[in-house]
Amino acid sequence: MEYSYRTKINVLFIVLILFVFAALGTAINAPRRKLTKKYRGPCMAVNSIDKCWRCDPFWAEDRQKMADCALGFGINAMGGKYGPYYIVTDNSDDDVVDPKPGTLRFGVIQKGPLWITFARSMRIRLTRELIVSSNKTIDGRGKYVHIANGAGIKIQSASNVIISNLRIHNIVPTAGGLLRESDDHLGLRGADEGDAISIFNSHDIWIDHISMSRATDGLIDAVAGSTNITISNCHFTDHEKVMLFGANDHAEEDRGMKITLAYNHFGKRLDQRMPRCRFGFFHLVNNDYTHWERYAIGGSSGATIISQGNRFIAEDKLLVKEVTYREKSTSSVEEWMKWTWITDGDDFENGATFTPSGDQNLLSKIDHLNLIQPEPSSKVGLLTKFSGALSCKIRRPC
């Protein structure tokens, strides 16, 4: 069958149109697709924290070097440095009143500094929330360690805690009852809410290279006067309310809260609270925000938020462009205009916007604080390239 000249022209025109739309779609989605491409080249330490320890083939022979690598407000978190090593050999969590030696629960309740590692890759289903005491490091490097399908981690009235290189997901609420809180104290606790990591009345905390998704409540909550916290190199996906810093608008004890978010990737299928802040001081530096629905950064109660060198890529939806959200202040613009929210050197893509407020000269007055110096936002894709739990191998660069 022969086609007419006009038919051939129409077919060619349709093919050309389809090609143009395909090319435009690729261009629009290119930044997101690059983020999901798996890197298979040589080890790269791409940000100020990772450069402290990564890519040394002998990292596993001096694991405690990592305790010197925190930056930001959690810089003094030493974890279990100078303490002995404890190796988790048993992935069970059957007895929360008298935990078995070899389990993770037995390790985290011991007195004194302890550096906790894992004998093999394992999946741990916590039957009750895991109470982590002071001067502990949970170090999952070199193994694939999942905390999943059970309770989450609770850091309560503790200091000097490091949690590194875990995969935490599908966290659910668990019932109350008797629970071993330390090696010499048994407590009666209420039901937990299903947070993946909950920080309560604690200080000097560092959470690094954690992959987190799908908890019943928050992925990371910090409340009740908690402060001096750094959350870095983490990868968050598949969650509604990601982070809550400050329990409520009456929690005056949170006025001194200071938290750093650095080199994190806020990824697919996230909704809001990245973070949601109250009262304190929050430094968000060189993070990659590639997905949000309601908002990315929210707050109330006079929270101070400094956003530096971050990348914000808005969704294609017309009404999902604004990064910020002020809660409980819609009736009083005069109120939230006093809250200091600064954007400095951020990159806004696909129509993303950020509404600043308050003292825009604050950066010149806070040189005394432990702030990570931001790198250009054009480098954020590289700085966060290895966010989440790493696939480290012993005697190889990590």
UniProtKB/Swiss-Prot annotation:
Its cofactor is Ca(2+). The active site is at R273. Ca(2+) binds at D192, D217, D221. Its EC number is 4.2.2.2. Pathway: Glycan metabolism; pectin degradation; 2-dehydro-3-deoxy-D-gluconate from pectin: step 2/5. Might be needed during pollen development and tube growth. Residues 1-27 form the signal peptide. GO terms for biological process: pectin catabolic process. Belongs to the polysaccharide lyase 1 family. Glycans are attached at N135, N228. Binds 1 Ca(2+) ion. Required for its activity. SUPFAM superfamilies: Pectin lyase-like (SSF51126). This is Probable pectate lyase P56. It comes from Solanum lycopersicum. Keywords: Calcium, Glycoprotein, Lyase, Metal-binding, Signal. It catalyses: Eliminative cleavage of (1->4)-alpha-D-galacturonan to give oligosaccharides with 4-deoxy-alpha-D-galact-4-enuronosyl groups at their non-reducing ends. GO terms for molecular function: metal ion binding; pectate lyase activity. Expressed in anthers and pollen.
